[in-house]
């Protein structure tokens, strides 16, 4: 009879007790009290999901041009059928059997993307378990643009608007809307190099270009490898992102800019995870979407429209990224 209420705390919830006043404060009461003085700050958080919605998806390349680009980025028919297709058809990653007798990337005599040289090597058991399904209230892929300063420095934090998206994965239409939205505050950096240039010199070039752009007030860097041709080759995007991210950190400039990637290499969730892990803010896998369009035109997705295929693919990537986040991950 002396128990007034009972229950248990959910993920991210708290309670408070004022013993001298004999009061118990619930999770919502505490958070409402703390949030009162931050109303102005909340008005500066601008959600871009409606402005950058998935609609009227278009492809960039098709036919022989697309096949050449797929070959250039090391995307095989097996990748399209066993990895890409199930992600759009089932809205989740394909399930495969255990066992992989292929050589390690460093020992292989076949082309392996740079992503294959990185492994998710460690998973820490926690109690209670960190699970992206049961802990969905405190796990999010919400992505923040601009104003990347110290979140504890409130005076500085409230000087500029903060733009957020629910996912770091952008479709082709979203990416175009993104570029138009930020306009002059974004600059594109070409991540390809010609036959007479070295990869080392090209990396130095994009590092210098990024520094100049940030010092000129640009808030959105766009790293793109779309300019490949008979005379220009793509640089490994993972290397480009990591090089620019580290360079800007050393120059004390990283907090002023977001790094957005337009890559033909990214296809599976591991490639997205590694790109984000080395510093990418958003990723637009344009060749993956063009490959989906190619398969959609062949009526391989049944009743689904192309827009729906794109949405289902992004949904599968998001779900897997949350699973990767739910464990302690070290990349070697």
Question: Predicted segments — roles?
Answer:
Residues 192-200, 229-237, 297-309:
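Glycine-rich tight-turn/loop motif centered on a GG-T
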Residues 128-133, 216-223, 325-332:
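Flexible, glycine/charged-enriched surface loops at secondary-structure junctions
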Residues 25-30, 36-192, 198-206, 211, ...:
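Extended, highly charged accessory segments
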Residues 90, 94, 98, 189-190, ...:
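Alpha-helical context
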Residues 185, 197-200, 204-205, 211-271, ...:
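Conserved structured catalytic cores and adjacent interaction surfaces
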Residues 1-30, 34, 42-56, 110, ...:
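Phosphate/diphosphate-binding loops
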